[in-house]
């Protein structure tokens, strides 16, 4: 009897040990599921931020391309009028007249092609309805919505289900609405001005700087110096950030004595061209670049200005909402995930809590330098974090 009793006790002990082991394995598996779900949700949010960074860079490049297109059309029209006028003067120089005629025809064809291309490209890039920029901005909004409660819960639910059919996981609600205010669409003028400054810094020198040059001719003047050609050109963005304008002019300037003083004035416009994208004004409004030195050429450029209304101004990017961030240099966004395993009865359910955060850090292989967080470089990552006291308290309200 004693041996039989010991055998029964041994079997019961083995069963208890087995069930305890099974429970420990199940609990650890649920903890791992919660960690995986939290990290997956945070990773998705990091990818959303990185998408914003990539799309913001694409939008900036798109704005640069529009500025380049406007500048190219203006310069092509300027070169067309310059070569056409040169060909007219070539009638007085028979040996070079055929060459100047061919150059003028080629320039006219190039200007025609540039206008036709810009008429398609600028609306395709900047149209407020179906432009590439608008599509990128809409994609940013869709991605942002996917990182909110419903979309994020779909991620955690799929991760939990892949771990075990009886596992469920969801993101705990954030009473501070930290993620909702983590980023925001630029709306204020100062926000758009910052984007415009970044875009203009990305322009090549030919577009960003005034295109000014003084060319001395062999024609003497009574001022004891030579007559000169004055080239003036500039590409500008209007103060309201809604219109691009580019102008190029070249005029012959006459120097003469007047009341014992040497004076200079525009005598003959030789080349001119202008283009605008946005609000159609058919007039040169730029005040920079010394365009006033060639008033006649400037007026002719405005009268023949290429115009397209298929542009709605500098883009409104989605950026970090610095006003709502506790740390504006290295902000992070937390989330907490609670996982549950159903075992039939409500009292037999198991629960697990895990937290993760999204943070900004340059990759290990990048040059060693300090870089503050932004939505222009895709360096957002995710990692697990220790649940906070507030998250633990909130999780207790979810347990039944």
PLM feature segments, named:
Residues 1-74:
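Alpha-helical assembly-interface signal, strongest on the long, hydrophobic N-terminal helix that forms
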Residues 61-400:
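Long, compositionally biased low-complexity segments
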């Amino acid at each position: 009897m004693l041996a039989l009793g010991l055998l029964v006790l041994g079997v019961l002990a083995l069963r208890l040990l087995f069930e305890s082991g099974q429970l420990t394995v199940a609990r650890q598996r649920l903890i791992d599921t919660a960690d995986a779900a939290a990290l997956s949700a945070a990773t998705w949010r990091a990818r959303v931020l990185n998408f914003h960074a990539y799309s913001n860079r694409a939008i900036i490049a798109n704005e640069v391309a529009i500025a380049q297109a406007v500048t190219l059309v203006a310069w092509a029209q300027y070169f067309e009028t310059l070569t056409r006028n040169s060909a007219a003067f070539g009638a007085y120089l028979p040996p070079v007249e055929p060459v100047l005629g061919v150059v003028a025809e080629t320039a006219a064809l190039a200007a025609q092609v540039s206008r036709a291309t810009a008429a398609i490209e600028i609306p395709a890039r900047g149209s407020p309805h179906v432009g590439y920029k608008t599509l990128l901005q809409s994609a940013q909004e869709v991605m942002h919505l996917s990182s909110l409660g419903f979309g994020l819960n779909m991620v955690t639910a799929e991760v939990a289900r892949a771990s075990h059919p009886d596992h469920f996981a969801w993101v705990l609600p954030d009473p501070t609405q930290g993620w909702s205010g983590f980023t925001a669409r630029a709306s204020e003028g100062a926000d758009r001005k910052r984007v415009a400054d970044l875009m203009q810094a990305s322009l090549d020198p030919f577009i960003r700087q005034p295109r000014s040059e003084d060319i001395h001719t062999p024609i003497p003047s009574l001022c004891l110096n030579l007559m000169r050609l004055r080239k003036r050109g500039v590409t500008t963005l209007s103060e309201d950030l809604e219109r691009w304008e580019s102008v190029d002019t070249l005029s012959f300037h006459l120097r003469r004595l007047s009341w014992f003083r040497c004076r200079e004035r525009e005598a003959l416009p030789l080349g001119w061209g202008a283009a605008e994208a946005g609000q159609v004004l058919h007039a040169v409004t730029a005040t920079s670049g010394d365009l006033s030195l060639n008033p006649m050429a400037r007026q002719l450029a405005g009268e023949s200005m290429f115009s397209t209304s298929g542009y709605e101004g500098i883009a409104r990017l989605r950026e970090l909402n610095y006003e709502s961030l506790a740390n504006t240099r290295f902000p992070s966004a937390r989330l907490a995930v609670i996982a549950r395993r159903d075992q039939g009865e409500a009292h037999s359910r198991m629960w697990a809590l895990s937290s993760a955060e999204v943070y900004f850090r340059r990759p290990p292989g990048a040059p060693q330098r300090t870089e503050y967080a932004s939505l222009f470089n895709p360096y957002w990552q995710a990692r697990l974090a220790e649940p906070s006291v507030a998250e633990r308290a909130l999780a207790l309200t979810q347990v039944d």
